[in-house]
UniProtKB/Swiss-Prot annotation:
Catalyses which reaction(s): Cleavage of hydrophobic, N-terminal signal or leader sequences from secreted and periplasmic proteins
Extracellular domain ranges by topology: 25-166
Protein name in UniProt: Putative signal peptidase complex catalytic subunit SEC11B
GO MF term set: peptidase activity; serine-type endopeptidase activity
Length: 166
């Protein structure tokens, strides 16, 4: 392989990565949410299955409603939780707290919250589901189950892009 072909392959790979990054950042601006999220468990079945890609919005002015699918970042947990808003508790001063539950879970999420926390607040919401693509994120779900294979797949994809000829 001559150096110009290698240069072309590296440049092509860079364009693919930068295009994906621009699309991602554009969606962040439009939706007000950091990124789409992949469901990693079956706790929201039958509405959403493991591997579904959820598109989120997180507009501050939108009130939280019972029945909405919320993506939550719980203090002390690395992976966000995707569950439905079960109950809302509103104080006289307008401060809202809420309780969540996975559709496929027998009990509410109080066992998942940090110790002595019984309700969530707006600050815990990463986004709210507004759309989905079925099973497109199953690869991400599998990589989460088998983390050591993540690096093998990334290496093979990078190698394929560099070696692939057009």
């Amino acid at each position: 392989m001559n150096k110009w072909r290698l240069y072309y392959q590296v440049l092509n790979f860079g364009m693919i990565v930068s295009s994906a990054l621009m699309i991602w950042k554009g969606l962040m601006v439009i939706t007000g949410s950091e990124s789409p999220i992949v469901l990693l468990s079956g706790s929201m079945e039958p509405a959403f299955h493991r591997g579904y890609l959820l598109f989120l919005t997180n507009r501050v002015e939108d009130p939280i409603r019972v029945g909405e699918i919320a993506v939550l970042r719980i203090e002390g947990r690395k992976i966000p939780i995707v569950h439905r808003v079960l109950k809302i508790h509103e104080k006289q001063n307008g401060h809202i707290k809420f309780l969540t539950k996975g559709d496929n879970n027998a009990v509410d999420d109080r066992g998942l919250y940090k110790q002595d926390q019984h309700w969530l607040e707006k600050k815990d919401v990463v986004g709210r589901a507004r759309g989905f693509v079925p099973y497109i994120g199953i690869g991400t779900s599998l990589m989460n189950d088998y983390p050591k294979h993540k690096y093998e797949v990334l290496f093979l994809l990078g190698l394929f892009v560099l070696v692939h000829r057009e």
